[in-house]
Amino acid sequence: MTLPLLPRHDSDMPTAYQRTLRLRLMLLALGVCLWAGVIVVRLVQLQVLDRSKYEVQAARQSERTINLDPRRGPILDRNGRQLAVSVDVESIYAVPTDIDDPVRSARELATALQLDAAARRTLQAQLQRTRAFVWVRRKVDAATAQAVRDLQLEGVGFVTENRRYYPQRELASQVIGYVGLDNTGMSGIEYAFEDDIKGRAQKMVIRTDARRRPLGHIDKPSTDGHTVVLTLDESIQHVAERELERAVAETGSVAGVAIVMDPHTGEILALANHPTFNPNRFQAYPSARWRNRAVSDSFEPGSVFKIFTAAAALQEKVVDPDEVIDCGHGFVEVAGVRINDHDVFDQLRFREVMAKSSDVGVVRVAQRLGRENFNRYMRGFGFGSPTGVDLPGETGGLLRPTERWSALSLASLSFGQEIGVTALQLASAVAAVANGGALMRPTIVRRVEDRDGNVIRSTPPVSVRRVLEPATVTAVTALLEGVVEGGTGKLAAIPGYRVAGKTGTAQKIDASGRYSMIDHVASFVGYVPASRPAVVVLVSLDTPRGPRNQGGDVAAPLFARIAEPALRRLAVPSDDPTRVLRAAAPPAARVMPASYVPANAPAASDDDDGRMPDLRGRSAREAAITAARRGLVVELKGSGRVVDQRPEAGAAIEAGMSCRLDLARPGGQAPR
């Protein structure tokens, strides 16, 4: 068969066909390029621009991160005794996708964990979910963990966590504080030093397949928290709490506080509250027991405040210890208000005014001092402002500005009314008298260390300001010794030691807003030995009952029962050289408080000859203590060891002079 021949157009047909073909090829190539470009752009977007977003989505779909509590750093007393530690415990988890019979598993787990019916139903609902991980019970005791382990249930596992444990139970509980269920500090040192103690959380990453079946888990290690070393001495703290509990029980008091402090450094050796609580099970106690009354509760101090009225008057030379004061036959009228003494006194020397605690006599002296001078000294002693101690919840008390005083205020303030103070403020102010006149900032933390024992930071003694001259301190001490030797504080006496102190019985405000004739706060604060104080001790009992419930009756003997064991603990020599002091079983290695230097400690000089000792090369603490004992007001610059000092070694010095110590670490530069 012969096909017909198509007509040919030699001149134009090939050219048109080729053009069409070429155009089609170009369009096809362009389409391919555009398609490839879109793919490339999309790939760049997915793999480069949006990579992190899709990685997060993928991880979210295939991984679950479980945060485990970090190991909190320990809290230790000054001698390394453990007050708060973290112990390993087991937590129980389940992988629901690996459990074949969630109903049976829930029933058996509920029996082992002693769950009620409602909790068992909740657990069963959790096990029936299509999830890779659920908590069954966290931080169980060893017996419970073993009971669950004995069930040998598929899909049930264990992970090691840690729990806070307080080995000394109630000891210093208001100071140490406690942690909540999430292992976060809720009060005390646990709260105040949370950032140091908490550490970095451990993470458990669980990986799953497309059906959410676990493929295993990866543990990301935690970082332990830092160690916090307190100024407390466990032995002295134990004595303070034991004797305070006894006194509260014997007197029927509502509550009580006791503080033992080193007056030269401001370090708190004991801080006791009663009633107390066990932080291992803090939920079992009313929240009022968690409160640290020594820093958060203010009260009218009563006659113990006469210490500061007397100190200001003697410093300003408006009275002499042997000057006779007219005590008005037991009363004085101020601004139309009659102020009565607790007894009828007529003419008393000022030292007798203090020994017998005459309100009228103190009012007479305060009137000579004047309101502006009086206010200046009281604020100098720190009243009306927080002490700055590293404890949460501290209040500054109440001292109104003079423009808000009434015509009666100066008289009332002179014997401790119309003012609110905390127990720690009061102890710190008395420490300023005991140490020669310098107000020291009270400290509760000595240092913070890392897990290897390296010091992160420490707390050297800080002199806030000088309040009294040494001569005034000597005169005040003599007055306070008279209180114990022949006045209202006889029961505070300690055999073999000279004690200086003052009693107080402060009326409380009743529901009508008036001073109660029944309820009061009984207190005693003092220092011992009077000539070279090693400790300041404050005790306060809230609303003691019974026929003998004054400060001299109930607080003074409590002072003695706490101070005497503290002196033994610190091996402070007796004022009577014929007495042999029995040591209270000190630990093998301990750091002595500043108020006592053992015989083998480096001495500032062979004798205190009125010359500046050579303090170069010493630690900040050792140098500051040595200088403070010579009556110097110490100013520290820098950190580390002493590299320079002013006055220079060998220069003549006298009490009250300023002393600058420049500190530097090895390889560092001294401050300019």
Task: Give a label for each model feature.
Residues 496, 510, 539-553, 558-672:
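Ligand-recognition elements built from short beta-strands and adjacent flexible loops
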Residues 172-174, 267, 307-308, 427-430, ...:
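Short, solvent-exposed alpha-helical surface patches in non-cytosolic proteins
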